[in-house]
Amino acid sequence: EFPAAEPQEAVAHFLCRLSVETDCADVHHALVNHEQDFILLHVVGNPEQFARRHVPGALHLPWRQITAERMAHWPADTLFVVYCAGPHCNGADRAALKLARLGLPVKIMTGGITGWEDEQFEFASHTLVSAS
């Protein structure tokens, strides 16, 4: 019913997709081999959830809090890799859209937390310190 795309059309499609996506294995490889050329953003949840479990090296910046002022802390050519809870969550898409609208390079880490867990990669955690 749906014939395969012509090879050149398939190449264009996959190049386009890979220009806006990465996966858990590629992010893990970059982290363990000290080849990280991106800022990893955990874009959903609250600080307590992030403290309990997140991808090592990630910063917690919920997508609703992404603003030009916040992102001005990084050089304009910084690549951001965003992730959320998993395929059932659209937080990474929302974050990526906001970052792209700000003119910043961005990719989504497909799979998110669920994908990271499925790959059996280790999570980071830390204890929150109360201000009181």
Q: Which ranges hold each PLM region?
A:
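Glycine-rich, highly charged phosphate/nucleotide-binding loops
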Residues: 61-69
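Terminal peptide-recognition signature
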Residues: 27, 58, 99
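Short, charged/polar "capping" segments at the starts of alpha-helices
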Residues: 47-50, 90-91
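Short, hinge-like loop/turn segments at secondary-structure boundaries
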Residues: 59, 77, 123-127
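Short active-site oxyanion
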Residues: 34-40, 56-57, 79, 105
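Short loop/helix-cap segments at secondary-structure boundaries that form the rim of catalytic
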Residues: 50-56, 116
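Flexible, polar/low-complexity N-terminal or interdomain linker segments that lie immediately upstream
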Residues: 1-48, 125-132
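Catalytic cysteine-centered active loop of the rhodanese-like fold, especially the PTP/DSP P-loop
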Residues: 69-117
